[in-house]
Amino acid sequence: MPELERPTFSVQDLIPLLEENYGLCCTLEELPGERDRNYLAQEKNGETYVLKISNSCETLEFLQVQNDALERSAKLLEPGRIPKIFPHKNGEPLLRVRSGVGSQHWMRLVHYVDGLPMAEYRPHTRDFLLELGRMCGMVTKALHEIPAPPSSHTLLWEMHNVQETLEEYMPWIKDEKLLSWVKTSLDLYSQTMEPLESKLRCGWIHNDFNDYNVLVVPKISVNPDLGLIDFGDMTHSYLVAEAAVACAYAMLDKPDPLEAAVLLIRGFDQHFPLEEKELEILFPMVMMRLCLTLTLGTFQQQNDPENEYLGISQKPARELLERLQEVNPRYAHYLFRDSCNMEAFPGSSEFRNWYKKAEGSFHCLLGEPLNPENTVVLDLSVGSSLSAKMEGVSLEKQVEIMDSYLRENNAEIGVGKYAEARSFYSAKEFLNNSIDGEEKRTIHLGIDVFAPSGTSIYTPIDGVVHQLQDNQSELDYGPTVILRHKI
């Protein structure tokens, strides 16, 4: 990548340039930026613009792609939610200017997009995250159709080169724990990507749906208006990377990061449907964006310690990457598939075919078939008389109540229903953090089988003991055996 030369203009240089080329008399205030110079330009009448001066390495062809992206995105979003180009007096969108040190730069003026950065806006409700996903999907739909071919423009924040970039900049990380997370995440990404790379769709993407580029205008009693700025990191890359970048930032500081990602992906998919292979790589790609943020941020901060903008995402990104180390990638993959109205498990149809062929060959769980003569179906739902008797009493008392109930119904075995709403889950262990606050578990995802102590239990097919554990927390499962079967 060529060495970047940030523009070296002063405010005193730029004010006459604005008046001469745009006919505007403005005050200027510099805005944060990584490679370019950006200024808030304000007229006395209140009209506000952003003056953008590109670094010396930015080509005209790439800036024209950005202009095309701005125009295409503006057609899909609400008016004023995407920067609108303000042409100079000759009618052109770009102006070539020379700095005081003699370097050449392209200058562009756009209308200011109002709003709070998403990082400063709360709450990020379910509806908000869905709407964020919809906007991201609409922008992806607009940009991927840009006919311009991939340019020679190179970018460190490019998912195509993420492995090379991380390997080059990882030596700057002195935090051993962080370094181990980055290496583990990179291994996961490389292994997942290898068989998928040639099958992923590519095109132009915004590539920087971060929480400071998404702007929010709050509204009373309705969803806020969302806008998007800074198309300077556009790149020709995997289309799914757009969703991955947006997810990485939407998941920051969330009580349940995966829920935030699921909501965003659901909204994204409504406007730009994701393919199966893209969903398979999406979670590892989210982790790659976090690794880029942390690795490049470490490097940039050490080389430009006074630029606070370079470190704004470091702390929450580190916390999120640490939390995601505990997430099984397959679990995230299945959640993402479900959010796009696909079967959560890719092998579901294969399993159903196996089950149909094997039906009738399974061994009975308790040694003999369950039937109306020996079995009673239990009602343990909220408000049932049996549920009311069993709530708030000891395990020993619950066993007495269940034994008595089976005798009263002349049954040897009791069966509890799947997906039943229950009020048993009152212990703190059953509280889950969600986007909208704490939620208590209510739905029973399993089938209960109650039988007298000492009853023999059989596996339906051959298997091995995967895990044996006594869960001793209040209202927990008690002794638990998990079996693994191979089919």
Region locations from a protein language model:
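An alpha-helical support segment within catalytic cores of ATP-dependent transferases
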Residues: 10-18, 145-148, 165-207, 217-220
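A cross-family kinase active-site recognition segment
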Residues: 120-177, 200-202
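A conserved alpha-helical element in kinase catalytic cores
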Residues: 53-104, 121, 126-130
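Active-site activation/catalytic loop segments of kinase-like enzymes and analogous catalytic loops
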Residues: 239-273, 287-305
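Zn2+-dependent peptidoglycan hydrolase active-site motif and core
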Residues: 459-487
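Polar/charged, compositionally biased leader and regulatory segments
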Residues: 341-448, 452
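ATP/Mg2+ or Mg2+-diphosphate-binding catalytic cores
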Residues: 171-172, 293-346
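Active-site acidic catalytic loop and adjacent metal/ATP-binding pocket
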Residues: 34-46, 50, 85, 190-241
